[in-house]
Amino acid sequence: MDASSQYSALPYPQPPRVPSAAPSAGRLPWSRVGEIVIFTFVSVLALYLLWLWVLKDCILLLKAQRGRSTEELIFGPGERPPVASADGSRPVPDPSPPVRRDLDLSRV
């Protein structure tokens, strides 16, 4: 037997094969999962900011156009109906102090 035919000068008869990518197992790659998570986060943030800056004001505006002012929507009705007394004689007026509209703030 000839020793030169059995052994070559190179350690490997052929260069080793290096796989270009891992075989797919039918699942999403991690980069795609990361893209989906980032897209979901940005979408939720955009919807929250849209609600905070635009949609809430539009709803208040539509309710105010139906006859109620925005102050009534936020703070409740401006005037309360009188409360009936326990003995039924006459209604008791609202205990809150009246608003003074005669103050002139231009002299301050």
From Swiss-Prot:
UniProt membrane topology term: Single-pass membrane protein
GO BP term, pick one: transport of virus in host, cell to cell
Key words of the record: Host membrane, Membrane, Transmembrane, Transmembrane helix, Transport, Viral movement protein
Disordered: annotated segments: 1-25, 73-108
InterPro entries: Gemini_mov
Biased composition annotated in UniProt, kind: Basic and acidic residues: 99-108
Main subcellular location: host cell
Signal peptide range: none
Transmembrane segments: 35-55
One Gene Ontology term, aspect cellular component: host cell membrane
Entry's localization field: Host membrane
UniProt xrefs under Pfam families: Gemini_mov (PF01708)
Subunit annotation: Interacts with the capsid protein (CP). Part of a MP-CP-viral DNA complex.
Function per UniProt: Involved in the viral transport within, and between cells.
Family: Belongs to the mastrevirus movement protein family.
Identification of the protein by name: Movement protein
Organism: Panicum streak virus (isolate Kenya)
